[in-house]
Swiss-Prot record:
Protein's job: Catalyzes the last two steps in the biosynthesis of 5-methylaminomethyl-2-thiouridine (mnm(5)s(2)U) at the wobble position (U34) in tRNA. Catalyzes the FAD-dependent demodification of cmnm(5)s(2)U34 to nm(5)s(2)U34, followed by the transfer of a methyl group from S-adenosyl-L-methionine to nm(5)s(2)U34, to form mnm(5)s(2)U34.
Location (main, coarse): cytoplasm
GO cellular component: cytoplasm
SUPFAM superfamilies for this protein: FAD-linked reductases, C-terminal domain, FAD/NAD(P)-binding domain
Protein name: tRNA 5-methylaminomethyl-2-thiouridine biosynthesis bifunctional protein MnmC
Organism per entry: Burkholderia pseudomallei (strain 1106a)
Residues covered by region (FAD-dependent cmnm(5)s(2)U34 oxidoreductase): 266-660
Record's catalysed reaction(s): 5-aminomethyl-2-thiouridine(34) in tRNA + S-adenosyl-L-methionine = 5-methylaminomethyl-2-thiouridine(34) in tRNA + S-adenosyl-L-homocysteine + H(+)
InterPro entries assigned to the protein according to its UniProt record, in alphabetical order: FAD-dep_OxRdtase, FAD/NAD-bd_sf, MnmC-like_methylTransf, SAM-dependent_MTases_sf, tRNA_MAMT_biosynth_bifunc_MnmC, tRNA_MNMC2, tRNA_S-uridine_synth_MnmC_C
Cofactor needs: FAD
Length: 660
């Protein structure tokens, strides 16, 4: 992976404090981690009083450690009857603990706390540990208390990851090992990165009062003052962001400004229904418009789809996005299930088989070189694959222990059910275009020009039609036909898990097997064809040699056709859309523009171009859009968000003088 994560080693000193053998320093004061968190960071930032005046409040912490600062803050938020509506806690950690080590460390600290004036913390430890993510580089978003508390963990070196975050912080917890033990975390570069994320009223607190830290704070635009430290420590620093000069070219993201929290989502497939659920969870009232008579009727209406991350030796953008999307989707799906919105999915893993011995060796080497955790993926020899799948295979491959298959339509229905009475549906109506009125509200119009719905925000999530409806000239997408084949009981090897490789095979209910799929660009025929079934049978024979393609009459098989929407660079288009008309007017000044310089179509967002990866990308894409609309911390690195920014094609056109 980009930089493999080296977990922290759990060691206790005789006095019960947790110590890092790597840095030779303690994680917390011997006088108590939770008491230290309360004195230094919570009260040092004027909490809980300050968050009472915000709808949402964002904290950044440098150094998650044992998690006690987060646990203490979460408990304080719970105990405050006037707390903010949503609390966002973002924490960077280079060496996170493994799940059970984190549980042991936090539970030990909580057991010996002397704080009795806040919400009991012991139950929160288990919630945190149970949700703890795989130790992979990048951003991991966890949700607690029905999504009102989010913990965004960023695993990696703070010097690298802080400049790659997109958020607006109200408070900073400057933690970490002592400056003498970990100088990088207190370097001027760190404070300059934090200054670019600070709200105008942001505060900070830290236990240290070293001269080097004070100089770095001052240079970055933070005003500081000394106050009494914790447990007899003479002094600590608190202060606020108060730059004496302009310190940043781009302001950190703000919430979309509107008095009416209503939105239109066009397209009721995986992309659209995921957006519906995420906006409704934040209190938005959503109108979902679908041209078919029911939701998930097009590509999302397939009997099953497979979900798994992508692994590449160079850990490229697509691989990082698929890993982030896969892990985020699992977290969201489990939350839906816990809330009583169950849907059909397999939970016993998925196997990806190599197409040659050389490819298997590359797959095995990639796992080792990238340091992929076994809970994410592991190498599977040919013999092991045979034993696991109970049938012959030509080569080994990967086991994705948390991968599997899912009913896309059932997932979409669960997401709509979770939205409850905040969702209104309009089906059987096709939107022809969008227009923004003088009042700033968007109107969705049909072919006759009649207004079907209006709202402050619109999200186009209707695949290949999205760019047309939004009036985008610089969003190159292609419609790709995919034909599936259904095999009757007993006609194919009865594999217990979904298998992918050159094609895929998914066991369905009642012994039926799903296999596919063809890949036919610009073919608009929606009728299953015998040639497509034959192609799928031949692909299945290569995947599972025990199957004979000639044993079945391709012309007698049932199947289904769906259409993928694929962008020219094979990445999705997710986020706020560019204002192409404004860009054309300013084209001369935008020839060297970056994405953050491009004018945007205020209140208009896209979620399309997911190709064959809708199950993996839709949940993360929806969370990104909801975060952008509400001005929350983004759930992935800015580099990845920019890779899928719908305006990326507009920027390329501007650079080549093709916008007029």
């Amino acid at each position: 992976m980009t930089d493999r994560i080296v977990p922290a080693t759990l060691v206790f000193r005789e006095d019960g404090t947790v110590v890092s053998p790597l840095y030779g320093d303690i994680y917390h004061s011997a006088a108590g981690a939770l008491a230290q968190a309360d004195h230094v960071f919570i009260r040092g930032n004027g909490l809980p009083e300050r968050w009472r005046h915000e709808r949402a409040f964002t904290i950044i912490e440098t150094g998650f450690g044992t998690g006690c600062n987060f646990l203490a803050t979460w408990a304080a938020w719970r105990a405050d009857p006037s707390h903010c509506e949503r609390l966002h806690f973002v924490s960077v950690e280079k060496h996170p603990f493994a799940r059970e080590d984190l549980r042991r460390a936090a539970a030990h600290i909580v057991a010996y706390t002397t704080i009795t004036t806040i919400t009991p913390i012991a139950p929160l430890v288990d919630e945190l540990a149970n949700a703890w993510p795989a130790l992979t580089p990048g951003v991991h978003r966890l949700e607690f208390d029905d999504g009102r508390v989010t913990l965004t963990l960023v695993f990696g070196d703070a010097l690298d990851v802080l400049p790659n975050l997109a958020l607006r912080a109200h408070a900073f917890y400057l933690d970490g090992f002592a400056p003498s033990k970990n100088a990088d975390l207190w370097s001027p570069a760190i404070f300059k990165s934090l200054a670019k994320l600070a709200d105008e009223r942001a505060t900070f607190a830290t236990y240290t009062s070293s001269g080097a830290v004070k100089r770095a704070l001052d240079e970055a635009g933070f005003a500081y003052r000394k106050v009494d430290g914790f447990a007899g420590k003479r002094a600590m620093l608190v202060g606020e962001f108060a730059p004496r000069w302009r310190v940043r070219r781009h302001e950190p993201p703000r919430a979309f400004s509107t008095d009416r929290r209503d939105a239109i989502v066009i397209g009721a497939g995986l992309a659209g229904c995921a957006v519906v659920e995420r906006l409704a969870a934040r209190g938005w009232h959503v109108t979902l418009i679908e041209r078919r008579e029911r939701i998930a009727s097009e590509a999302s209406g397939n009997p099953a789809g497979v979900f798994h991350p992508m692994i590449a030796r160079d850990d490229n953008l697509a691989a990082r996005l698929s890993r982030a999307g896969f892990l985020h989707a699992l977290h969201r799906w489990r939350a839906l299930e816990r809330a009583g919105h169950a849907f059909s999915r397999s939970t016993h893993g998925l196997v990806q088989l190599a197409t040659s011995d050389d490819e298997f060796e590359r797959m095995r080497e990639s796992i080792d070189a990238l340091g992929v955790p076994a809970e994410l993926a592991s190498a599977l020899s040919r013999d092991d694959a045979r034993a696991l799948l109970r049938t012959d295979v030509a080569h080994g491959g990967w086991l994705f222990a948390q991968g599997g298959s899912i009913s896309p339509a059932a997932l979409a229905a669960a997401q709509c059910a979770a939205a409850g009475d905040r969702l209104s549906r309009i089906v059987g109506v096709e939107i022809a275009r969008l227009e923004r009125g003088g009042d700033g509200r968007w109107r969705a119009l049909d072919a006759s020009g009649a207004t079907i719905a209006q709202a402050s925000v619109v999200v186009v999530a209707n695949a290949a039609d999205a760019a047309r409806i939004a009036g985008l000239r610089h969003a190159p997408t292609q419609r790709v036909r995919g034909q599936l084949t259904l095999l009757p009981p007993g006609s194919a090897p009865a594999v217990p898990l979904p298998v992918i490789g050159d094609g895929y095979v998914v066991p369905l209910a009642n012994g039926v097997t799903l296999t596919g799929a063809t890949y036919e660009p610009d073919d608009t025929d929606a009728t299953p064809r015998e040639a497509g079934h034959r192609e799928n049978l031949e692909r299945l024979e290569r995947l599972l040699p025990a199957f004979s393609a000639n044993a079945l009459d391709a012309g007698a098989l049932a199947g289904r056709v769906g259409f993928r929407c694929v962008a020219s660079d094979r990445l999705p288009l997710v986020g706020e859309l560019g204002d192409e008309a404004a860009a054309a007017r300013e084209a001369a000044a935008l020839t060297g523009a970056r994405l953050r310089d491009v004018p945007r179509a205020t209140g208009l967002y896209g979620a399309f171009g997911y190709g064959s990866r809708g199950l993996v990308w839709a949940a993360l894409g929806a969370e990104l859009i909801a975060a952008q609309i509400d001005g929350e911390p983004w759930p992935l690195e800015r580099e990845l968000a920019e890779a899928i920014d719908p305006a990326r094609f507009l920027v390329r056109a501007l650079r080549h003088g093709r916008v007029a």
